[in-house]
């Protein structure tokens, strides 16, 4: 009689869909959130990262499929040959470029192009939905223990799903500010020279 224990649990699922927009036109909110009929509130919109070009010659793709080719080197010298899935490629070699025609080089990011927009030119047409900020499931758990005139209340909150856009880390790792040190992950995994296998 002197001891009591109460517990409660709740769970909810977040399902949303944009049914109608003014004039039915999709638009970009704040250069990050993509709003379109049939889409979801909280959709991130941007470029999708594939990898970092290891060499200048790594910016090479097979005609038609746009599969990335592997340049062949011997003693550090490019042999003017490429492999596709381990086999020598003899077709036309395509490159990805900026809108001004400048090709990407070693150390640049290899951005994905969506189906239907694969022309090798990385521009606004290559931005796509890359995630959603809203969790799929949220809920809570609370419990209370009471003994005579003493009580202890504990509460937990949880969420599952949903991506996080860390704006602070983005600015920290952009090398925009002289007094800011990038994160160790960026420091140790940044491309510095031809042949480096890097993430950034």
Protein language model features and the residues they cover:
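Residues that define the transmembrane beta-barrel architecture of outer-membrane proteins
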Residues: 3, 135-139
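Conserved small-residue
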Residues: 2-129, 173, 184, 188-200
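Transmembrane beta-strands of outer-membrane beta-barrel pores
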Residues: 11-17, 147-149, 158-162
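Short, hydrophobic/aromatic alpha-helical segments in well-folded domains
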Residues: 123-126, 138-141, 146, 159
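C-terminal beta-barrel architecture of Gram-negative outer-membrane proteins
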Residues: 152-200
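Transmembrane beta-strands of outer-membrane beta-barrel proteins
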Residues: 5-7, 141, 147, 152-154
């Amino acid at each position: 009689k002197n001891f009591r224990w109460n517990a409660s649990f709740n769970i909810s699922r977040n399902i949303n869909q944009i049914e109608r927009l003014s004039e039915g036109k999709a638009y970009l909110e704040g250069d990050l959130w993509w709003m379109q009929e049939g889409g979801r509130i909280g959709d991130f919109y941007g470029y999708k990262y594939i990898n970092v070009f290891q060499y200048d010659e790594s910016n090479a793709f097979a005609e038609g499929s746009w599969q990335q080719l592997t340049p062949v080197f011997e003693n550090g010298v490019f042999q003017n040959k490429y492999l596709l899935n381990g086999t020598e490629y003899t077709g036309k070699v395509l490159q990805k470029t900026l809108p001004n025609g400048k090709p990407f080089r070693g150390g640049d990011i290899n951005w994905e192009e969506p189906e239907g927009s694969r022309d090798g030119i990385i521009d606004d047409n290559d931005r796509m939905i890359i995630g959603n900020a809203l969790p799929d499931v949220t809920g809570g758990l609370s419990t209370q223990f009471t003994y005579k005139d003493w009580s202890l209340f504990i509460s937990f909150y949880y969420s599952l799903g949903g991506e996080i856009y860390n704006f602070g880390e983005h600015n920290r790792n952009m090398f925009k500010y002289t007094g800011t040190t990038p994160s160790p992950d960026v420091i140790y995994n940044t491309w510095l020279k031809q042949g480096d296998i890097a993430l950034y």
